[in-house]
Amino acid sequence: MEKFEGYSEKLKFPRQYFVYPLLFQEYIYVFAHDYGLNGSELVEIIGSNNKKFSSLLVKRLMIRMYQQNFWINLVNHPNQDRLLDYNNFFYSEFYSQILSEGFAIVVEIPFSLREQSCPEEKEIPKFQNLRSIHSIFPFLEDKFLHLHYLAHIEIPYPIHLDILLQLLQYRIQDVPSLHLLRFFLNYYSNWNSFITSMKSIFILKKENKRLFRFLYNSYVSEYEFFLLFLRKQSSCLRLTSSGTFLERIIFSRKMEHFGLMYPAFFRKTIWFVMDPLMHYVRYQGKAILASKGTLLLKKKWKCYLVRLWQYSFSFWTQPQRIHLNQLENSCFDFLGYFSSVPINSLLVRNQMLENSFLIDTQMKKFDTKVPVTPLIGSLAKAQFCTGSGHPISKPIWTDLSDWDILDRFGRICRNLFHYYSGSSKKKTLYRLKYILRLSCARTLARKHKSTVRAFMQWLGSVFLEEFFTEEEQVFSLMFAKTTYFSFRGSHSERIWYLDILRINDLVNPLN
């Protein structure tokens, strides 16, 4: 325990003071608004027809914040269904949104300063690249071919509000900011937002995603901090005694020599004593822990993780959230893909003089497939088809222009093909394209009060062009003037596109 506390003090964030007066500056909220517009997800105000940013309303909020009764109402009436004593639903939602966005901007400042002031400046870009979503699939494709066991982890949720505040209290000393954060959490938990009753922690309210992401990332970073400590303590490379380390190497060499003499008896024991090769990958609420160790070692890690959540976060999690499987015989879903590492047999005919014989070679391949049923379920949820995959019209889009309808359907289709470009089998994507294409035709026919057949004949090739700009054409346009690419047989080629910054509900149905 003393060793852990010393490690914790060395690697954790230093305590920071939040710049609390920034909450009273108008430019903070303007900056938060501009950040939302330039980001991948637009921040919308629920209940308002005009979704433009209003500097006048921000100035009114600043005036009310300087009044003494404003903060008294927040403390004495934190469980009100409306904010700031306003009867108007628009004012309540607008002020709630800009306060949470501005607060999220302020609380992120100490964490950004820590990354900039890190003494190991040369290692920062490498660390960020490893944590990027862009590197996940190439990493899995390169490393998982040499591993044996896989632990598929579902990070437990929801976490109690007080635990979230305690995690932040370790790093900050600004009491007013913590009180304001407590108010936001109590206010939105009463609205059944992301912490208390949502099925998934990532289905956040649109107007407060930035703040909730910050809180969730704080929780996950704390959990991974403990996991990193356990990983380093389990490695023999962390031993401080050089004599013990040399003895471990000599003992391992003796075991290898003994294993050559008695291979049947010693094959499974050798990897339990030697330092296991472990890899950890996480995105959103799912994580993968893979290694070359034995099944007994993986069961011990499962016990460590369950007790970690129980004693460090006061959170009881079911052991069923951690699935242990042999990598060669299991299929796991991650980032919207069904992935596996099957063993394929390859027969090679060898000719030596007058004799010929066949060599059976076993090869591993990282296989990724498109999940058909969940994707059709997502399309049905978005009202593009029925639950069985039969295309239907989209009545809510009939008020749009023909070009906007074509553009929306075409964009969804291109995004699906773009994201699943790394799939080893793409026949499923053509079924999704058929659903979207016929749904688009039914929507246009319903708008113009015509039949689908007549409308498709009238549109002709213009209608088809919106649905045939696939990944091969996009990729060839990017390199048209520099390099020639032949995309014949592209159904067997895999190209991982690295510009996917987020995954919407249609391409991430499994989480």
UniProtKB/Swiss-Prot annotation:
Top-level taxon in the UniProt lineage: Eukaryota
InterPro entries xref list: Domain_X, Maturase_MatK, Maturase_MatK_N
Keyword terms of this UniProt record: Chloroplast, mRNA processing, Plastid, RNA-binding, tRNA processing
GO molecular function: RNA binding
Main subcellular location: plastid
Compartment(s): Plastid, Chloroplast
Family under the similarity heading: Belongs to the intron maturase 2 family. MatK subfamily.
Listed name of the protein: Maturase K
Source species: Oryza sativa subsp. indica
